[in-house]
Amino acid sequence: NLLAVIEKELALKKSEANAVIPSLISLFEGMGERPRGRFFEGPEGAKAMRDEFLKVKSKMIYGIVDYDKLFQYWPGQQNDYTSVRAQKKIKTRTFYVSKAPVKDANSKEFMREAKFINSKDLDLGASITIYDDKISISTYSANPISVIIESDGITKTVKSIFELLWSK
């Protein structure tokens, strides 16, 4: 009967899968650190991602940001996020891209050190933020896409490049 044939076939497939699973698990575990990625979409996702920054354990955030685009898409950034970050005593060190230097880019009140990059020299389509063992990348648009990558090795590499450039 057809049902018996299907049951026998399924039992065989189950047996084959059970035989392969331990070696797959062993292979996967032997790969070392596996980065974890999280995706965020739309304005709500961008806000959720910024809320993640406020949970930083090291109390230090590094960033590469296009101020002109940031304030175009999130005009309330200073009040909505920066003030809260400063209240939580989270410092930031930022390379900011803009058409001209911004008056209060360096701010003790907002716990921010900043270095200017002229937008003629660098066109950013996304911001990059480095904190703890995470890197976030978020596009500038009315419907932004953001990703957070959690990886100690990747974060150390990007942070080392950031610090090298900062020291120049």
Regions inferred by a protein language model and the residue ranges of each:
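A compositional/biophysical signature of low hydrophobicity enriched in polar/charged and small residues
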Residues: 4, 11-12, 48-51, 145-146, ...
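Short, conserved loop/turn and helix-capping segments at secondary-structure boundaries
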Residues: 11, 75, 79, 152-155
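Short hydrophobic/aromatic-rich motifs at helix boundaries and adjacent loops
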Residues: 20-23, 52-54, 130
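Short, charged amphipathic alpha-helical surface segments
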Residues: 2-36
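Mid-protein regulatory/catalytic core that forms ligand/cofactor-binding pockets
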Residues: 26-124
